Amino acid sequence: MKMKPAERRRARQSAVQAIYQWQITKLSAGQIIEQFSTDQDLSKTDVPYFKELLTGVIHRVDFLDEKLSPYLSRKIEDVDMVDKAVLRLAMFELTQRTDIPHKVVLNEAIELAKDFATDESYKFVNGVLDKALRSLKLREEEQGK
């Protein structure tokens, strides 16, 4: 069964909240998934994708932070927690889910920043990911993809 875009969006929204929670509590992915399954209405959410995003970000956080760092004007530790959750999620999709068009990842990240972060966060997220995408596209062109 093909997922609807709204179900994917809800998976990303839940994942940003779960990543934020993980960044603060350092609970395991399993514990956070259990909490979300109990406390949140996930009935119209692509739950397998939510789980993939959360576990993927947690297991690859050092790799994702390394990929983001060249495009940040400050250390990753100094980035707002919500912005960091959105950026990590987007970088996970850009590097691990190459079946999802870059434009979709960028647009979704901007919307997530608008939904959850400060008024100016979406501009920061857009700027970081735009620079990262340009670099990613150059590398793909060099590799002949």
Curated annotation (Swiss-Prot):
<keyword id="KW-0805">Transcription regulation</keyword>
<dbReference type="GO" id="GO:0031564">
    <property type="term" value="P:transcription antitermination"/>
</dbReference>
<comment type="similarity">
    <text>Belongs to the NusB family.</text>
</comment>
<dbReference type="InterPro" id="IPR035926">
    <property type="entry name" value="NusB-like_sf"/>
</dbReference>
<comment type="function">
    <text>Involved in transcription antitermination. Required for transcription of ribosomal RNA (rRNA) genes. Binds specifically to the boxA antiterminator sequence of the ribosomal RNA (rrn) operons.</text>
</comment>
<dbReference type="GO" id="GO:0006353">
    <property type="term" value="P:DNA-templated transcription termination"/>
</dbReference>
<keyword id="KW-0694">RNA-binding</keyword>
<keyword id="KW-0804">Transcription</keyword>
<keyword id="KW-0889">Transcription antitermination</keyword>
<dbReference type="InterPro" id="IPR006027">
    <property type="entry name" value="NusB_RsmB_TIM44"/>
</dbReference>
<dbReference type="GO" id="GO:0005829">
    <property type="term" value="C:cytosol"/>
</dbReference>
<protein>
    <recommendedName>
        <fullName>Transcription antitermination protein NusB</fullName>
    </recommendedName>
</protein>
<dbReference type="Pfam" id="PF01029">
    <property type="entry name" value="NusB"/>
</dbReference>
<dbReference type="InterPro" id="IPR011605">
    <property type="entry name" value="NusB_fam"/>
</dbReference>
<dbReference type="GO" id="GO:0003723">
    <property type="term" value="F:RNA binding"/>
</dbReference>
